[in-house]
């Protein structure tokens, strides 16, 4: 009659079974051996195999203990306390341990390094406990490792370092000629010696940080030559390609240009100022009216943008007299006020003494496009409209021939006449054309020769000429020409 023992690992969901012949049970040694064989756990040198009762969680530490049939056990695989000394190896080899209890195997001799450190009472209790758990064994292993590493660190801290220059590398060969005038040792930042013969190569206290900053990417106009700095004042000192000590100086010209542009007034700045005459101010923003226009209801002066925004926000209601249905297309531009405001802006810009030569450029760049279009419309519709139109026509008339002459395709160069070939035929070796095959050249030459010997027949006979006899007509019929 056969019996069954059920087992499963801690992370396993469904239990597995071991079938054996007998009615009593199976020894712990045989159960562990069957588990290793079924699960293919290897030779068992790197782990220990533990069995626990599934109901009471009691460990089966005696290999000779008989586990009754139909018993469920929990299997745990823990790391070996020493590498390659796992206790599961004896179950694979088939050599049982006759001493019995596994608790003796837990009480292994403490390593020599561990004996030097005092053992706490908690650790001694864990070792002396007959039912030591898996966590206690792992904790003991970690404690031994940490003690060994701590002792190693203490030895390393008290040891004296031995400096051996060029221990792992071969000394570089020093050139036999003196360094060039602009050569710099980029190890110490000094001149007069090669980097292979630098005095700091044999210095054990040298940190190895480079003492030289290169001027890569910095224009020469931004560099200024200085004297050789002291040992501790070389923070901002660099060395150029010629070996001279330089420092970076600021771009004074660009900074002055920026400051002058910032100090110069623009048209936008003038429009934001308080107007010198209240009649030129906008009714809403109280500033110079930009693109001045008037409302048809109360005839007040507004900026074009201010009045349009106010009408759109108030459902086309005048902000001054509160009249309804004031549409945008009913606003009347005041060209007279626009010219007066432009004169005020120009006078303020002209009175600015700083960078007066750059004021016109900044004014034109900052002038809105609507104002530029309005100026063009005023010039075209003003008293000088005929002069403006004539100048525009003149500029267009002078620009078109120049454009056409620039875009004209150059004429084909005259080709020399080749004997035996028609005049418009290009030469054979003309640049840009492929070379003509010899057979084609012979065919063209033969055709020209045939045409010269036998010119085409034409109807040059006079009107009163006699008709040729029928025999001649039959032999050589005349060709019809149009």
Swiss-Prot record:
ZnF region ranges: CCHC-type: 183-200
Give the CC-aspect GO terms: nucleus
Identify one Pfam family in the record: DWNN
Please provide the record's keywords in A-Z order: Metal-binding, Nucleus, Zinc, Zinc-finger
Please provide the Gene Ontology terms (biological process) for this protein: co-transcriptional mRNA 3'-end processing, cleavage and polyadenylation pathway; protein ubiquitination; ubiquitin-dependent protein catabolic process
Compositional bias per record (Low complexity), positions renumbered to this chain = 451-466
Q: A Gene Ontology molecular-function term?
A: zinc ion binding
Residues in RING-type zinc fingers run 282-322
The species is: Schizosaccharomyces pombe (strain 972 / ATCC 24843)
Cystine pairings recorded for this chain: none
What's the protein name? Uncharacterized RING finger protein P8B7.15c
């Amino acid at each position: 009659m056969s019996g069954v023992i059920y087992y499963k690992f801690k992370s396993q969901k469904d239990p597995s079974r071991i079938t054996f012949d007998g009615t009593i049970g199976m020894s712990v040694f045989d159960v562990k051996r069957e588990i290793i064989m079924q699960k293919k756990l290897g030779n068992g040198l790197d782990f220990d195999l533990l069995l626990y009762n599934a109901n009471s969680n009691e460990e089966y530490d005696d290999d000779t203990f008989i586990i009754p049939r139909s018993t469920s056990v929990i299997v745990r695989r823990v790391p070996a306390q020493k590498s390659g000394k796992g206790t599961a190896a004896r179950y694979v080899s088939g050599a049982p341990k006759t001493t019995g209890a596994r608790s003796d195997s837990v009480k292994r001799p403490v390593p020599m390094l561990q004996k030097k450190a005092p053992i706490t009472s908690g650790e001694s209790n864990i070792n002396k406990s007959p039912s030591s758990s898996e966590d206690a064994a792992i904790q003991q292993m970690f404690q031994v490792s940490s003690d060994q590493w701590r002792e190693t660190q203490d030895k390393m801290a008290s040891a004296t370092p031995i400096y051996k220059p060029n221990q792992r590398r071969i000394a570089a060969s020093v050139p036999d000629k003196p360094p060039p005038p602009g050569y710099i040792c980029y190890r110490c930042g000094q001149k007069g010696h090669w980097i292979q013969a630098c005095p700091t190569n044999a210095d054990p206290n040298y940190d190895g940080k480079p003492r030289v900053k290169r001027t890569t990417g910095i224009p020469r106009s931004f560099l200024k030559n200085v004297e050789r700095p002291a040992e501790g004042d070389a923070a901002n000192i660099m060395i150029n390609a010629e070996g001279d000590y330089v420092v970076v100086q600021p771009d004074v010209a660009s900074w002055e240009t920026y400051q002058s542009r910032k100090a110069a007034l623009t048209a936008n700045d003038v429009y934001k100022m308080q107007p010198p005459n209240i009649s030129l101010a906008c009714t809403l923003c109280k500033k110079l009216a930009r693109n001045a226009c008037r409302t048809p209801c109360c005839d007040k002066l507004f900026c074009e943008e201010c009045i349009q925004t106010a009408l759109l926000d108030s459902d086309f209601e005048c902000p001054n007299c509160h009249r309804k249905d004031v549409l945008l297309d009913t606003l009347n531009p005041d060209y007279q006020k626009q010219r007066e405001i432009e004169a005020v802006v120009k006078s303020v810009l002209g009175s600015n003494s700083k960078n007066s030569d750059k004021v016109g450029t900044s004014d034109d760049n900052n002038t809105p496009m609507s104002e530029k279009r309005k100026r063009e419309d005023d010039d075209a519709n003003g008293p000088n409209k005929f002069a403006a139109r004539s100048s525009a026509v003149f500029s267009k008339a002078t620009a078109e021939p120049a454009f056409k002459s620039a875009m004209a395709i150059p004429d084909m160069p005259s080709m020399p006449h080749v004997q035996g070939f028609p005049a418009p035929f290009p030469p054979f070796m003309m640049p840009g054309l492929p070379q003509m095959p010899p057979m084609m050249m012979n065919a063209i030459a033969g055709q020209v020769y045939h045409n010269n010997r036998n010119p085409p027949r034409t109807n040059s006979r006079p009107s009163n000429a006699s008709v040729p006899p029928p025999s001649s007509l039959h032999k050589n019929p005349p060709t019809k020409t149009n």
